[in-house]
Amino acid sequence: MVESSIPLAKQVIQARSIAVTLDDDQERRFQHLLEETTMIDLHQHPMVKPEDPSQLLEYLRSDSYAWGYEAVRHGGFTAVGTANVYRGMLNTDEMSFIRFADLLDEISMMLSDIERHDEVVKVSDAEQIEAAKQQGKVGFFPTVEHLAIGNELQRVDVLYNAGIRLAGLTYRRRSYIGDGQ
């Protein structure tokens, strides 16, 4: 595995401009809501990207990415849909035409990384999301920005076996299964 030496962006930043001052009662209520609410973001790109955006393609060429577990937890989310797609930029500048192999590589790298982190778990349904919350873990719900299956419908089964339960049919362009326009 070739890990990237490219400096990555910070996962958590303190944005003072959006801080809301709460009194003690409001703070208690807010904390209670955070603890009791199951909060899911179904369209996230939780890959930690380079500090310098011009290094993104170089970063994508590595075979190990950092994932935003810390940011997801800090944001109070129970689970996030991962909207995998970025590795596809290695071979095209039009996201509607990413290669299936690139998409599957990114999903595989993410799932492999999840297995190495005790505080994160792959989730595929509501029961697993609730279990992750009860265990104090962050759930990563593998999704794809679009299917990128071309005319090979059996690839839907491949993605299903990789844990994909939610996918955009197209990105922008027409394909065999939908029209993004």
What residues fall within each predicted segment?
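N-terminal hydrophobic targeting/anchoring segments and the immediately downstream early-domain regions
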Residues: 1-181
